[in-house]
Swiss-Prot record:
Gene of this entry: dbo
PROSITE patterns to which the protein is assigned, alphabetical: BTB (PS50097)
Alphabetical keyword list: Actin-binding, Kelch repeat, Repeat, Ubl conjugation pathway
Residues covered by region (Disordered): 1-56
The protein's name in its UniProt record: Kelch-like protein diablo
Superkingdom to which the source organism belongs: Eukaryota
One matching Pfam family: BTB
Location of the BTB domain: 74-141
Originating organism: Drosophila pseudoobscura pseudoobscura
PANTHER family assigned: KELCH PROTEIN, KELCH-LIKE PROTEIN 20
GO molecular function per UniProt: actin binding
Length: 628
């Protein structure tokens, strides 16, 4: 319990106890205190016991409430609707800033014994006054719509919070818009935020509700302009807008352009844009709407111009949560180069054919830049190529309007660094190359950069930490295990640690901050072995071998998993793929492509924005005339 009453706090133990005992009689000690222990007389201190009652507030409130109910000592009567509510000014002022300002200021009500309160429900006021006296209230569906505005008026923050919590728990797709409007009206910011989030997340159900059809135009715009709107495709947003419009065409058609500008038309599939949006009579009859449709068509038709056309309508909505898909491009199959391209979706484990390239390409370099897939160079079975094609997954079309490389290249390495597309090494039919050039999509031009220190065909390239790595390949005489990296800031190539194995026509990818090198061919045979490079330690270390030998293999990371695609095992072209698990250090087979592919390229992209990605072959250009 600490020092005894009257002690100095400087003595303890037997000595201190003896001093106290020896001076007790001369000091007149009663036994409840110690005096004179230091030889100096001091006035005795009174005994103390501190106590705080936990019952007192509750008992006091209970008694005050009893006085109120018996109308005793009440000094104010509230006239609310047709009801008189007796109360005590001091209690109301202590609980409510509204009443405190009313009764302690210079307002006329401060001198009145009866005060009329307008614009408040009498039952809600009764509940709130009860709460002031009892600290208890029940919020339910039948009273929350009158209780919340009353609590806002009286500035009873605790009740506002309880009402908002109740409404949060009641949110569903049929009432969330009403709750949102209610929260907005009464400036309940947290409830408004929660209702907005709920509406955005459940938009696909909300758009089917009657509340949605009854929305005023301003609230509709607030909802559909959000980046957080959770939709499978922008088609759902357009359909929702048109349902809202057609609920009352006479009054709402004047708002169509105002609303349609918040639908991200450039993200629609061409088929839907032309066949549904562009052909809608209400859209066609409005000049501003036609302009929006034309803008979307231009965005789809001119992929090279997209960097200059970015804006709110071209920005994908965040919750779309599109997964990644893998494209296998060209290659060698059944004794000839092929132009076929197919797409792998890990979520369905399906390979689907997409539009083929205009040229057959084996030894093609493939990379993704600005959501477009580039196929660089290769060999068509007769000639070495310097031409390039670019694939747009939104339109399922290849375009050939990309500037060619300065040299013909097959078995070329291609990668993207700092917004530029790099073409590294390869062969031109005369010699093995150490040339490196890069493509600027804004200028549609290639420019040469510093050459590698070694000529390399069948080279693999990777980008990590702001550097471009050239890995293995062949110098035209024998396979290489050497590795060099390019620093674009210094325009210089520098050697780093070599692989443990010589590899040409290997697969390469960056995975979990390592560079993985798999398969390929050494001096004697096709390889199944694999290794990875740690840039922090500048070392290579082996990982488990693939299930098959694979030369001319594609390697890519899709949705956080490492896939090895196709290749040649020494006796047959492969269409199998396998996936690597770094935790178990194991490869497992996981399906087959439609085509066997040796020396094909692979690229990874986000799944197309629209669900009907595999749209029909009708060309957008055939429908690009402005509506009359």
């Amino acid at each position: 319990m600490g020092d005894l009453p009257g002690s100095t706090g400087g003595g303890s133990g037997p000595a201190a106890a003896g001093n106290a005992s020896g001076n007790a009689s001369s000091a007149g000690n009663t036994g409840l205190g110690v005096a004179g222990t230091t030889g100096v007389d001091r006035p005795p201190s009174p005994a103390r016991l501190s106590h705080t009652s936990e019952k007192h507030p509750k008992v006091t409130l209970t008694e005050l409430n009893m006085l109120r109910r018996h109308r005793e000592l009440c000094d104010v009567v509230l006239n609310v609707g047709g009801r008189k509510i007796f109360a005590h000014r001091v209690i109301l002022s202590a609980c409510s800033s509204y009443f405190c300002a009313m009764f302690t200021g210079e307002l006329e009500e401060s001198r009145q014994t009866e005060v009329t309160i307008r614009d408040i429900d009498e039952n809600a006021m009764e509940l709130l006054i009860d709460f002031c006296y009892t600290a208890h209230i029940i919020v339910e569906e039948s009273n929350v719509q009158t209780l919340l505005p009353a609590a806002c008026l009286l500035q009873l923050v605790e009740i506002q919070d309880i009402c908002c919590e109740f409404l949060k728990r009641q949110l569903d797709p049929t009432n969330c818009l009403g709750i949102r409007a209610f929260a907005d009206t009464h400036s309940c910011r947290e409830l408004l935020r929660i209702a907005d989030k709920f509406t955005q997340h459940n938009f696909q159900e909300v758009m089917e509700s009657e509340e949605f059809l009854l929305l005023p135009v301003g609230q509709l715009v607030d909802i559909i302009c959000s980046d957080e709107l959770n939709v499978r495709s922008e088609e759902q947003v357009f359909n929702a807008v048109m349902s809202w419009l057609k609920y009352n065409v006479a009054e709402r058609r004047q708002h169509l352009a105002q609303v349609l500008q918040h639908v991200r038309l450039p993200l629609l599939s061409p088929k839907f844009l032309v066949g549904t949006v562009g052909s809608d009579l209400l859209v066609r009859s409005d000049e501003a709407c036609r302009d929006l449709v034309d803008e979307a068509k231009n965005y789809l038709l001119l992929p090279q111009e997209r960097p200059l056309m970015q804006g709110p309508r071209t920005r994908p909505r965040k919750p779309t949560r599109r997964g990644e898909v893998l494209f296998a491009v060209g290659g060698w199959c059944s004794g000839d180069a092929i132009a076929s391209v197919e797409r792998f979706d890990p979520q369905t484990n399906d390979w689907k054919m997409v539009a083929p390239m205009s040229k057959r390409r084996c030894g093609v370099g493939v990379a993704v830049l600005n959501d477009l897939l580039y196929a660089v160079g290769g060999h068509d079975g007769q000639s070495y190529l310097n031409s390039i094609e670019r694939y747009d997954p939104q339109t399922n079309q290849w375009s050939c309007d990309v500037a060619p490389t300065t040299s013909c290249r097959t078995s070329v390495g291609v990668a993207v660094l700092d917004g530029f597309l790099y073409a590294v090494g390869g062969q031109d039919g005369v010699q093995c190359l150490n040339h490196v050039e890069r493509y600027d999509p804004k200028e549609n031009k290639w420019s040469k950069v510093a050459p590698m220190t070694t000529r390399r065909l069948g080279v693999a390239v990777a980008v990590l930490g702001g550097f471009l790595y050239a890995i293995g390949g062949s110098d035209g005489q024998c396979p290489l295990n050497t590795v060099e990296r390019y620093d674009p800031r210094q325009n210089k190539w520098v050697a780093v640690s070599p692989m443990s194995t010589r590899r040409k026509h290997l697969g390469c990818a960056v995975f979990n901050n390592y560079i993985y090198a798999v398969g390929g061919r050494d001096d004697c045979m096709e390889l199944s072995s694999a290794e990875r490079y740690n840039p922090l330690t500048n070392t290579w270390s082996p990982i488990v071998a693939m299930t098959s030998r694979r030369s001319g293999v594609g390697l890519a990371v899709v949705n956080g998993q490492l896939y090895a695609v196709g290749g040649f095992d020494g006796s047959a072209y492969l269409k199998t793929i396998e996936v690597y698990d770094p935790e178990t250090n194991q490869w497992r087979l996981c399906g087959c492509m439609n085509y066997r592919r040796l020396g094909g390229g692979v690229g990874v992209m986000r799944a197309p924005q629209t669900e009907n990605y595999m749209w029909c072959e009708n060309s957008l250009k055939q429908h690009n005339n402005p509506p009359s």
